[in-house]
A protein has these predicted regions:
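Sec-dependent N-terminal signal peptides of Gram-positive bacterial secreted proteins and lipoproteins
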Residues: 1-25
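Conserved functional micro-motifs across diverse proteins
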Residues: 20-80, 84-323
């Protein structure tokens, strides 16, 4: 009986230790996956769209005047994680009091600022709030020395909750991120299910953008600096949805140079008879309608004539157009 009692006691001790170990795993950070829905239960769901090093954090639709955020030191750069985030609560959620983003590089923490893009893509503001059960594009970004971005980077997203904080994280090298995007070439077509089709037609480098067949008074655009050029990606965009869509809201385009620097696009609609240009942000495509849209990037001559690509995104889908 003594022998049996000892065996039973040891068995119970092992069982107790096993149960304790299993409980600790519940507090381990979740892994963030690109291209998939991630979630903090009953709080938010989010899907990472891009990870990049932009020169500025800008609205999706570039107008004549807009707010942007850039490094405080001209020698620094930004690291930016962009995601579509949905508030799972039935009440408004203030980002700054709910979530905290942090980049960890060489064991040093860089706390991320947040910027939210408006629903129409025309404005961007720091912080911001998600409407009850609403969805917005959100940037988590930090200012760092450019040399640091060659290293392995960890991004952590943490809930602001003193009693029961939750964390999700991912590790990556910036040079490997493009492997998650779908590659396209000129003459290919990008299909955004239920929204639009983008036929990639041509790329031109010019100092002046004007319609093909101007008549009378017409609109044209010139570079602001003699040392700059326009890189113009010409597309035909078709609205395949069942409602009107502003042409500038079909997708977002950014030019990426050989050093991974990014440049936002101005987009213009060229009339069907090619007689004039108009801003894509004032052009509405009805269901089934197609239009010629130019994505225009003003960059230095060196960037215009160097190795480059265009990244086109919409709602978590990302395409790299090889030029």
């Amino acid at each position: 009986m003594k022998r049996l009692s000892k065996i039973l006691l040891v068995f119970l001790m092992v069982l107790g230790l096993t149960a304790c170990s299993g409980g600790s795993k519940e507090n381990e950070p979740a892994k963030i996956e690109m291209g998939k829905e991630n979630k903090f239960d009953d709080l938010v769901s989010y899907k990472i769209e891009t990870i990049s090093r932009p020169q500025q954090i800008t609205p999706d639709v570039i107008g004549s005047f807009y707010t942007y955020y850039k490094p405080s030191k001209s020698t620094n750069v930004l690291i930016d994680v962009t995601m579509y985030m949905t508030n799972l609560q039935k009440k408004e959620m203030k980002l700054s009091s709910t979530l905290k983003g942090t980049f960890v590089i060489d064991k040093t923490d860089y706390v991320a600022s947040t910027a939210m893009v408006s629903e129409d893509g025309k404005t961007i503001s720091q912080g911001g709030s998600l409407a009850a059960e609403g969805t917005n594009k959100v940037h988590f970004y930090a200012e760092v020395k450019p040399s640091l971005l060659k290293n392995n980077i960890e991004f952590k997203l943490t809930t602001v909750d003193e009693e029961n904080p939750k964390e999700a994280n991912m590790s990556f090298k910036l040079t490997d991120i493009a492997k998650n995007y779908e590659s396209k070439n000129l003459n290919d077509k990008i299909v955004l299910d239920g929204r639009g089709e983008i036929a990639l037609q041509a790329v031109n480098i010019t100092k002046k953008l004007e319609p093909a067949n101007p008549v009378g008074l017409y609109t044209y655009y010139q570079v602001q600096n003699d040392g700059n050029s326009f890189v113009v990606l010409t597309t035909s965009i078709k609205n395949i949805s069942e409602s009107d869509i502003t042409a500038s809201n079909i997708a977002v385009a950014k030019l990426v140079d050989k050093d991974s620097n990014e440049y936002p696009a101005n987009s213009f609609y060229e009339k069907d008879d090619r007689s004039n240009l108009a801003s894509a942000s004032t052009t509405v495509l009805t269901p089934g309608q197609s239009g010629m849209i130019h994505f225009v990037f003003e960059v230095s001559d060196a960037v215009a004539n160097g190795e480059k690509s265009v990244r086109i995104t919409y709602n978590g889908k990302v395409f790299i157009v090889n030029l």
